[in-house]
């Protein structure tokens, strides 16, 4: 699981006290003791009754004494899990989380999946939540977003119990928002990020890193909706918060989004600067996944700035690194970028080959649907330039379908422009004009 703030836990909730009371009563009855017999000379019957009804939370010392009287492990009474069993489960969860942090995605997913059953059976809500969220995040990494969504919905229901703090609930909502965003449910994701941010701010606990990450992801939603002012505001707040906690991962995420916004606004030198800062932050963590992704982006930005040879070298570096770490979809992104360069350089046959290769590597990943659509668009344009109009039309239609799934007006407009160019090539100028008009209207900010 991603690193989160280390904070003191809030006071135990009434519901947790009730669960402890229920365990005490069950263990007392199993031991054949009355409340008076369990209390002995140390406590009153009324005090034991208050504990069993959840009215009083006993101290650690009292829990240990009661457990000794009942002949059970103190951990079993305190949390429902024997101390040795809990330690084994916590150790296994820590190992799975380490695999996730090391970007060993397949191994992390397998490790977390094996722990879901034991965590649920433990009766310890905090261990269940760790297992559910860890498994969900690992599954997102390997493209299993539907399974991830089910786990996060279960985690959300669990976190809404009284055991957890607003901060812990905010984390779950944040991860749920990330999953929804990658499933292209942008409006739903935006609502989840808003709710997560409100909970984090309300928690009164140190959580600058979490707030910064929520803001960075919320900026993606604004970008998808072409509200670049809101996106920029969120990224600026994220950068301010991340500098305060001095967390390279959080800083890298904020600069990553700042670079994308500057790119969309045509500020390519600034976008390159932000991308370089983001890559430096991730390099300090030896996070080769994000280093590969940012190297790809730097390749594209250098091409836009006229540094063609440097751009190609960066994209080849990104491709090699992505393959080395087993990230086929990121390798596909780099090949798609190379195809774009070859198309714009007039090397249409090479662009076709690389666009097809990119689509193979992307493999239909829902979280890469924007890149899939872009590769389909490059493929279509390369075919159009070669005079293979029927094949080009099929590629453009596929790109439009991908962009429909993405829900981005600007991406959809690029597909309509391409189809307009195809119609013009066929001499159907009325249809071309209609498609160009559709694209222009999709990009209008004012409609009346």
Listing of model-derived features with the role each one plays in the protein:
Residues 113-120, 153-161, 194-204, 236-247, ...:
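Amphipathic alpha-helical segments of tetratricopeptide repeats
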Residues 90-103, 129-144, 168-185, 210-226, ...:
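Tandem amphipathic alpha-helical repeat scaffolds
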Residues 1-30:
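A short, Lys/Arg-rich alpha-helix, primarily the initiator
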Residues 29-51:
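Short alpha-helical DNA-recognition segment
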Residues 18, 85-86, 122-125, 129, ...:
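Inter-repeat boundary and helix-capping residues of tandem alpha-helical solenoids
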Residues 2, 59-76:
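DNA major-groove recognition helix of helix-turn-helix/homeodomain DNA-binding modules
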